[in-house]
């Protein structure tokens, strides 16, 4: 048993076994991290997911679950899809602005070359 229980075991009010699947990813000093994930996915589902993954990918999976759970808590309707949509909209606006600026540059370059050509004649 770990001398300090991980955030998951504290939240679930149980002893933290030596081989606790949660302890490497939910430290005792960050209880909100597990609470958010538990609220959205449930401890049992998260435990099953982590046990099915290779050890080297578990940390990334936990970070992804935490991010998605926080997004779902913040925006229950859209979750992280709302952020994705917002970012896609910003990208589209920026691409449109870039295209407009490039067109303005092309027009200015054309006018400049016409002016230079007429000066030589």
Curated annotation (Swiss-Prot):
Annotated source species: Arabidopsis thaliana
Segment forming the signal sequence: none
Domain LOB: 4-105
Family, similarity comment: Belongs to the LOB domain-containing protein family.
Protein name: LOB domain-containing protein 24
């Amino acid at each position: 048993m770990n001398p300090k229980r991980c955030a998951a075991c504290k939240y679930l009010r149980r002893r933290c076994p030596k081989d606790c699947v949660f302890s490497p990813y939910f430290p005792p000093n960050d209880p909100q991290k597990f609470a958010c994930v538990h609220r959205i996915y449930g401890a049992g589902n998260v435990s099953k997911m982590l046990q099915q993954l290779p050890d080297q990918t578990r940390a990334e999976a936990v970070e992804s679950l935490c991010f998605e759970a926080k997004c779902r808590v913040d925006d229950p309707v859209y979750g992280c899809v709302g952020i994705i949509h917002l970012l896609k909209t910003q990208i589209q606006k920026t691409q449109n602005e870039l295209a407009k600026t490039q067109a303005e540059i092309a027009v200015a370059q054309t006018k400049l070359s016409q002016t230079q050509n007429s000066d030589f004649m």
